[in-house]
Amino acid sequence: PTLIRDEAKIALDSGETFYGHTRGKVELRAAISDYVHSIYNIDIEDERITVPGSSMSAITLACQMTLSKSDHALIVSPHWPNIDRAIQVTGAEYSCVRQLQTKNGWQLVIEDVRKSVRKNTKAIYINSPSNPTGWVMSREQQHELLEFCRSRQITIIADEVYHRTIYGINVAPSFLEIALETDPLIVVNGFSKAFAMTGWRLGWMITPASISEQMATLSECYNTSAPAFIQSAG
């Protein structure tokens, strides 16, 4: 979009070409917090928000943060193929629990998720709205899964980047609307889909406050932060 390109040009001409804060520009994190409030009517502290670069970078960081060699992760599939690779680089193993194709569209059976969890399961990746199936997780299912993962201390990595790609309603249900700040939940989102910024590689993640500093430290090992002028465009 023209407005976004213009903001990036202004930032470049203003000299925003140097390293930025690892967790992202203060102004952008505040704007993301405001955006989340505007669509979900919830308050997220800026300190819980990290802007590591692309949404895929955020997913990779979430996997690095929650998984190690002896662990297992569960992927709700069909899924984008990069997800299993993000898990594999941690040394963890993974398995998939599939959505089922029914006459009413794709569906996920939460009991199938429970049965697929192992003793060493540390993370569940779930993309809703889903690419490629278009399935959208219901609020009831979110409650069920969050309660289950809370009791087992399994981290939900919720990829909500398609939150505005939905028919009939303005925005898809988010785990953020029902979660406690301390819940084992990492929500990933970004600008690519909702704001037509696929090539800008700008996404964010919302984590429990208890791991936000560690997430920022881990981000330093990848790309330090998203380029400052791109953050200004966001």
Can you name each region flagged by the protein language model?
Residues 71, 92, 151-155, 181-183:
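A short helix->loop->beta-strand "cap" motif at the edges of active sites that frequently abuts
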Residues 99-168:
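Active-site phosphate-binding strand-loop segment of PLP-dependent enzymes
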Residues 75, 96, 125, 156-158, ...:
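Hydrophobic residues in well-ordered beta-strands that form the structural core
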Residues 6, 178-234:
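Conserved core segment of the aminotransferase class I/II
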Residues 65-87:
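Conserved PLP-anchoring active-site segment centered on the Schiff-base-forming lysine
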Residues 1-54, 61:
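N-terminal small-domain helix-loop-helix segment of the aminotransferase-like
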Residues 43-49, 69-72, 120, 182-185:
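Short acidic capping loops at alpha-helix termini that bridge into adjacent secondary structure
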